[in-house]
Swiss-Prot record:
GO cellular component, one term: extracellular region
Protein name, entry field: Galanin peptides
Any single biological process term in GO: positive regulation of transcription by RNA polymerase II
Primary site of residence: secreted
InterPro entries: Galanin, Galanin_pre
Length: 54
């Protein structure tokens, strides 16, 4: 961040907010993989349901 601030100059502080928004979008992109993990979590309870049916 220091090197980026040096390249961007004093306005880097204002740009820092923009950089902060970009990781937010990246975070949203990371949510779909978590859904896959949740699906795996549901697989556990489904197994329990199968055992209950038996």
């Amino acid at each position: 961040l220091n090197s980026a601030g040096y390249l961007l100059g004093p306005h880097a502080i204002d740009n820092h907010r923009s950089f902060h928004e970009k990781p937010g979008l990246t975070g949203k992109r990371e949510l779909p993989p978590e859904d896959e993990g949740r699906s795996g979590g549901f697989a556990g309870p489904l197994s329990l349901s199968e055992n209950a049916a038996v």
